[in-house]
UniProtKB/Swiss-Prot annotation:
Belongs to the IPP transferase family. The record marks T108, R130 as: Interaction with substrate tRNA. GO terms for molecular function: ATP binding; tRNA dimethylallyltransferase activity. Catalyzes the transfer of a dimethylallyl group onto the adenine at position 37 in tRNAs that read codons beginning with uridine, leading to the formation of N6-(dimethylallyl)adenosine (i(6)A). This is tRNA dimethylallyltransferase. Its cofactor is Mg(2+). The gene is miaA. Its EC number is 2.5.1.75. The keyword Hydrolase does not apply. Disulfide bonds: none annotated. GO terms for biological process: tRNA modification. The lineage of its organism: Bacteria, Pseudomonadati, Pseudomonadota, Gammaproteobacteria, Enterobacterales. Residues 42-45, 166-170, 247-252 are annotated as: Interaction with substrate tRNA. It is an enzyme of class 2 (transferase). Monomer.
Length: 316
């Protein structure tokens, strides 16, 4: 897209970052000085009744800066990157129509990627094809299926471990349904985002500081009633660990504790470790992200000024 065309597009701001990096505080500060409306980009914050363990903005924060795509689903419901893209595009169009700028804030990098680049036209899952693959795996073993994938799609086979049956099965299923490899189809992305996007990533300067923040926040969550929050979900009887909501970091560890699988101290240790691993994955995504401006979460005023400078410069 050339500069002239891009300059004529409506503006949007992405504020990305790992968990516990200060995204919400910066987003609220930005709303005070820019004509922005916030859209949450977080696969955990979409769920109702999951407030403490997701560090959902509190009532005061939401009053200062309302977020869209927050509390839109029951924890029993699933939500895909395609669902997010559809809902985010509708919210963005609504915000622009009101003469304001969409500010998308969160840490679900897959959602940002889907929004920015569009989605690959992959076929929907087919239970019959999946059952056939699983039967073949039961008879021959997953290693044999991995060798089969290597012949069909060597690029995907190099990326997928033989001990990852879910992804291995999906790669074969895509080929059997469409006649095209996963690699071919993922290279054909959908529609690019029709906005002039300014992208920012906020994080502490050191990994140690981020780890420290994560541990402090996990203990704050426990002190704020996280166990009671998960007990209420556990008591419903219709939720389980195969659901995306209960697989969220912190929730799945607390679920194991409530299920009698691990002691309390082990739950705390695993919860902190899982959150750190999530943050590491988020930072890895961002390190490879093109066109992103980095912000130091320990310098909030400097971070705010940098966003204003970049967004303001595009108006000149």
């Amino acid at each position: 897209m050339n500069d002239v065309t891009e300059a004529s597009l409506p503006k949007a701001i992405f504020l990305m970052g790992p968990t516990a990096s200060g995204k919400t505080a910066l987003a609220i500060a930005l709303r005070k000085v820019l004509p922005v409306e916030l859209i949450s980009v977080d696969s955990a914050l979409i769920y109702r009744g999951m407030d403490i363990g997701t560090a959902k903005p509190d009532a005061a924060e939401l009053s200062a800066a309302p977020h869209r795509l927050l509390d839109i689903l029951d924890p029993a419901e699933a939500y895909s990157a395609a669902d997010f893209r559809r809902d985010a595009l509708a919210a963005m169009a609504d915000i622009v129509a009101a003469g304001r700028i969409p500010l998308l804030v969160g840490g679900t990098m897959l959602y940002f990627k889907a929004l920015l680049e569009g989605l690959s036209p992959l076929p929907s899952a087919d239970p019959e094809v999946r059952a056939r693959i699983e039967q073949q795996a039961a008879e021959q073993g997953w290693n044999a299926l991995h060798q089969q994938l290597q012949e069909i799609d060597p690029v995907a086979a190099a990326r997928i471990h033989p001990n990852d049956p879910q992804r291995l099965s999906r790669a074969l299923e895509v080929f059997f349904i469409s006649g095209k490899t996963l690699t071919e189809l993922t290279q054909t992305s959908g529609d690019a985002l029709p906005y002039q996007v300014h992208q920012f990533a906020i994080a502490p300067a050191s990994r140690e500081l981020l780890h420290q923040r994560i541990e402090q926040r996990f203990h704050q969550m426990l002190a704020s009633g996280f166990e009671a929050e998960v007990r209420a979900l556990f008591a419903r009887g219709d939720l389980h660990t195969d659901m995306p909501s209960i697989r969220c970091v912190g929730y799945r560890q607390m679920w194991s504790y409530l299920n009698g699988e691990i002691p309390y101290d082990e739950m705390v240790y695993r919860g902190v470790c899982a959150t750190r691993q999530l943050a590491k994955r988020q930072v890895t995504w961002l390190r490879g992200w093109e066109g992103v401006h980095w912000l130091d979460s320990e310098q909030p005023e400097q971070a705010l000024n940098k966003v204003l400078q970049v967004v303001g410069a595009s108006q000149n």
